Amino acid sequence: MSGESVIEFTGFIKACRLFRENRLAEAEAVCTNLLRKNPLDQATWALKMQCLSDSTYVDELENEDMGLAETFLDQNVIAPNARPGTSFARPKTSAKGVNPILRPTTNAGRPLSGVVRPQSSFKSGSMDQAVRTARTAKTARAVSSTSARNMRLGTASMAAGADGEFVNLARLNIDKYAADPQVNRQLFEYVFYYLNDIRVAHQIAGTASKAAGFEDYYWKNQLAKCYLRLGMLQDATKQLQSSLEQKKLIETFALLSKAYNRVDQPMAALKTYSAGLEVFPENVTMLTGMARVQEALGEYDESVKLYKRVLDAESNNIEAIACVATTYYYGGKPELAMRYYRRILQMGVSSPELFLNIGLCCMAAQQFDFALSSILRAQSTMTDDVAADVWYNIGQILVDIGDLVSAARSFRIALSHDPDHSESLVNLGILKHREGKIDEARSLYSSATSKNPYMFEGNYNLGLVSFTQGKYHECRELIEKALAAFPEHEHCKKILNHLKPLYESI
């Protein structure tokens, strides 16, 4: 064995070998050395561009982050007054879906889901309020500009190279290289993912598509990606529909559904996913996309069915497991939810959120010994961005066992980690209200409603205080806000019925 010669790859073959093994930094270094010896080596030039673009690759199917301009200045929505259940802005009402008591909402007014997604954390409201809100890991403020964020990402990775910019686009003959099928794909991905110059990337894709006689589905998909980044959603839809006529791909169906979601047409997105499932039966990407849309529309039963189909096809899909577990927990089945969360734990995922969820499920299922150990584990491993939620849930458990003093202390600790934690403000206000400290309770309720206007508990409790103090006009406004968030809340309806004779007598 010792006498056998060992094959050692060198030059371009070594770079290709390293690239296939996903050792991108080493492959890039080999390509750099080769280009110093021969700057006109086109194959090495293309391989280095591929290494750089793969190092900053972002999956466009999961890239849902939108900036302030895209969020508040969106002119692509087709129906501003859509029927409930046919628009993300108007999901199914509480009478048909899960009410906010059983399914709490986030600061953005959306029901809690099993996983955090960028688009599900957007906080609607005025542009002025969003600009004045600082963007941290704990807020729902959209980024100032997605294009600027991507540009900073590209320039930061580019600055890491000692040779500076690899391709000088200002001096490059774009039309020449874009028409060359040997290097145009690598050049496009380098400009699109690494440099994030969407204008030049669009020029490359347009020239390449023209050189291919407008018959290459790949370039139609790339043009659609550019249009999606630029906010030209109608043009993106046309390119993707034309691409599907030539070749049906999973990516094309998913991108077309994404474009429909961006223009607030979830029904069209669901039809596109269904058409994709006819071509690619039980595909995880299609099923997951359909489940997300159904969840955003308030169709939790349909969403869970789709997530279960995802698990039948891919049993280790964490998003599907977490979403099914969340639905079971809020549906009053903590034992089933605990099984799913433990499955995630067995797969090697370890996070304070997971331990906290297991602890809450154990507490609801009367398994107090496991609940205590899980919550202590969550408390010991928590980070700053989840500390407020951990302490809030600890306070909830202390309220359940009757230790109100320690519960109030837990809510204060939660507020010290996140002053905008509206749930802790409301619960602390309720405890102050029980103690007879009406002014403190009123102040806490007011803070909660200003932090999260979509949480009906804050508006209802503040309206109740106003009703007892004789401030009937303020009470009516607050109760109407609470009913807008939870139309079937009986206590709000009773207060409104008490107020009607007073207004009629005037």
From Swiss-Prot:
- What are the UniProt keywords, alphabetically? Cell projection, Cilium, Cilium biogenesis/degradation, Cytoplasm, Cytoskeleton, Protein transport, Repeat, TPR repeat, Transport
Does this entry carry the keyword Oxidoreductase? no
Describe where the TPR repeats fall, as residue ranges on this chain. 217-250, 251-283, 284-317, 319-351, 353-385, 388-421, 423-455, 456-489
- Could you tell me in which tissues this protein is expressed? Expressed in head and tail neurons. Expressed in ciliated male tail-neurons. Expressed in thermosensory and CO(2) sensory AFD neurons.
Record note on disruption phenotype: Mutants have normal body morphology, but with reduced body length and width, delayed larval development and decreased roaming movements. May exhibit defective chemotaxis tendencies. Defective sensory cilia structure and function. This is characterized by increased accumulation and mislocalization of intraflagellar transport proteins and impaired movement of intraflagellar transport proteins such as rab-28 along the ciliary axoneme. Disrupted assembly of the BBSome complex at the base of the cilia.
What PROSITE patterns does the record tag this protein with?
Answer: TPR, TPR_REGION
Compartment(s): Cell projection, Cilium; Cytoplasm, Cytoskeleton, Cilium basal body; Cytoplasm, Cytoskeleton, Cilium axoneme
**Pfam families given for it?**
TPR_16 (PF13432), TPR_8 (PF13181)
Query: Which residue ranges does the record annotate as region Disordered?
Result: 83-112
Q: What is its main location?
A: other
Q: Which InterPro entries match?
A: BBS8, TPR-like_helical_dom_sf, TPR_rpt
Q: Which GO terms describe its biological process?
A: chemotaxis; cilium assembly; intraciliary transport; non-motile cilium assembly; olfactory learning; positive regulation of intraciliary anterograde transport; positive regulation of intraciliary retrograde transport; positive regulation of protein localization to ciliary membrane
Query: What would be one Gene Ontology cellular-component term for the protein?
Result: dendrite terminus
Q: What does this protein do?
A: Component of the BBSome complex. The BBSome complex is thought to function as a coat complex required for sorting of specific membrane proteins to the primary cilia. The BBSome complex is required for ciliogenesis but is dispensable for centriolar satellite function. Required for proper BBSome complex assembly and its ciliary localization. Required for cilia biogenesis and both the assembly and movement of intraflagellar transport proteins along the ciliary axoneme.
Spell out the subunit comment. Answer: Part of BBSome complex, that contains at least bbs-1, bbs-2, bbs-4, bbs-5, osm-12, bbs-8/ttc-8 and bbs-9.
Q: What is this protein called?
A: Tetratricopeptide repeat protein 8
Question: Which organism was this protein described from?
Answer: Caenorhabditis elegans
- Organism ancestry: Eukaryota, Metazoa, Ecdysozoa, Nematoda, Chromadorea
Encoding gene (name): bbs-8
